[in-house]
């Protein structure tokens, strides 16, 4: 969440940030500011009543010791206690209103993030590796997968519904090999390998920003306070939920391979064929918790770590700076890595590395202690990489004229 103090002290800054996202919430912000102002007034009243209660209680004790009549003081204490209880309840209700309203306001846009409306305004930073020139028309991955018997889309629909797949045979071996390669590269770059639950409670999804605003995008277990994770960002980040970390232990660098589950609400008609957009997919995630001064450097490190894997797999890719209108809810700054897909003749996102600054840390109460003072940490997350999309890129970039797939040398030892 954004800092409630900032909203009171610099309302225009928050409003401008939302406009940069093309998400003007002026009315909601104004109502929130009114609630916070009212809350502060009531809090001052409450503190005054508490001070008065303490003062009268001391007088009551002194008079009791002196065996002086205390009936008037006793009545005053009782009346004041009723007012205190009523005011405490009012303050508590206002706090809940504030937290609920703050929880649906997205992160402030970083100064480095360029202005823009949508993905058309994103800026290419650099390209890595030159796309191969084919002597034949390259096929799309779903054609190659079916030809080689690696992916069974029909069985995925039979077992579940559309946007599910079954990977089998040598395709399954490649899929497993990619996961092992990704984890090995991430570990080499200093990220601790962690396996986490694929189910989390509501508090964890609130901590990383999926709830309450994006409830329709996650799968909930019926009659349980449990949800299937949309990304290991949720579990890795929330390992430190409500935790104070010693500054000497920063940065904390983690990686995890997990299945991910997304309802893909609002994606009807997009990427209906193949493995680009699935309800269930595997991803190897990077998460870092850092000192605020180090988060920009960490973002670069995470990008290079993901890029290193793509270079090893001989997959052309590029870095793209997301504009303000294309940022995710929790992100302050995001750089995507897009991989070249010759079958589609375009670049597609395969990793998204985001710096959330202290936005998630404030929601999840992730702090560090420095010089005897507790401060909010910065959190970052990014794919390294989306396994299915990496397999898609592998098939399309390394296809041969007969439909067979060349295996890059870096992957051979894992097969």
Curated annotation (Swiss-Prot):
Gene Ontology biological process terms in this record: selenocysteine biosynthetic process; seryl-tRNA aminoacylation
PROSITE patterns given in the database record: AA_TRNA_LIGASE_II (PS50862)
GO molecular function annotation: ATP binding; serine-tRNA ligase activity
Record key words, sorted: Aminoacyl-tRNA synthetase, ATP-binding, Cytoplasm, Ligase, Nucleotide-binding, Protein biosynthesis
Positions bound to ATP: 262-264, 349-352
Residues that hold L-serine according to the record: 231-233, 285, 383
Enzyme's top EC category: ligase
Pathway: Aminoacyl-tRNA biosynthesis; selenocysteinyl-tRNA(Sec) biosynthesis; L-seryl-tRNA(Sec) from L-serine and tRNA(Sec): step 1/1
Sequence similarity: Belongs to the class-II aminoacyl-tRNA synthetase family. Type-1 seryl-tRNA synthetase subfamily.
Function: Catalyzes the attachment of serine to tRNA(Ser). Is also able to aminoacylate tRNA(Sec) with serine, to form the misacylated tRNA L-seryl-tRNA(Sec), which will be further converted into selenocysteinyl-tRNA(Sec).
Name of the molecule in the record: Serine--tRNA ligase
Gene this chain is encoded by: serS
